[in-house]
Every structure is written in C-alpha cells, then in structure tokens.
Amino acid sequence: MSKLHIKKGDTVYVNAGEDKGKTGRVLKVLVKEGRAIVEGINMVSKSTKPNAKNPQGGIVKQEAPIHISNLNPVDPKTGKATRVGRKVSSEGTLVRYSKKSGEEIK
C-alpha cells in the first residue's frame, strides 16, 4: 500500500461521490482500510438505543468513512484542491508540500 497523502487535522476537498465539491477537516484516518472520517462529509443516520448519554435514544446523524482516493488536501495558499509532494527540508525532516503553489502543508 502506498503512503497516505492526508493526515488527521488536514482540510480536504471531496473530489468524487455524493459530497463532491465540499471541504472538511479530517477527524480520523483509518490506515488499514484506506479511508478517512471527515467532519460534515458522508453523513449517515444511525439508530441508537436509550442510554445514559442519550436517554431518549432515536436516530443520530454521524460521519461515515470515505475512501482517501476521493479526497485531496486543500492548498494553504490558494484554498483550492492540490496534489501533495514530499521533500526533505533544511532541517533534514520530510515535509509535505503543495504541488500547485509549493507551499508547505502543516
């Protein structure tokens, strides 16, 4: 499996699927599955039984994982979707950068 181009906390653009064109922040990356959970994207309805946290139970909306091939990081400079490159910084660490603007992605 190749390296993942997104990390937790990244702002990503959805380039395919029902939520195409939307952006959101990555909440969790499921490495083995090659999927990510993105805030406000791919919402599903789940039925829950009454419990201490939710005494009434009922239907709850929550994010479902989306495949990482359908996500692109957002360029910090332009605010548009971009591809990611990797290069060695002056300190000797590997950093991710935007292919469009050359800006480092934190």
UniProtKB/Swiss-Prot annotation:
InterPro entries xref list: KOW, Rib_uL2_dom2, Ribosomal_uL24, Ribosomal_uL24_KOW, Translation_prot_SH3-like_sf
Pfam families recorded: KOW, ribosomal_L24
Alphabetical keyword list: Ribonucleoprotein, Ribosomal protein, RNA-binding, rRNA-binding
Gene3D superfamilies: 2.30.30.30
GO terms, biological process: translation
Organism domain of life: Bacteria
SMART domains referenced in this protein's UniProt entry, alphabetically: KOW (SM00739)
Name by which UniProt lists this protein: Large ribosomal subunit protein uL24
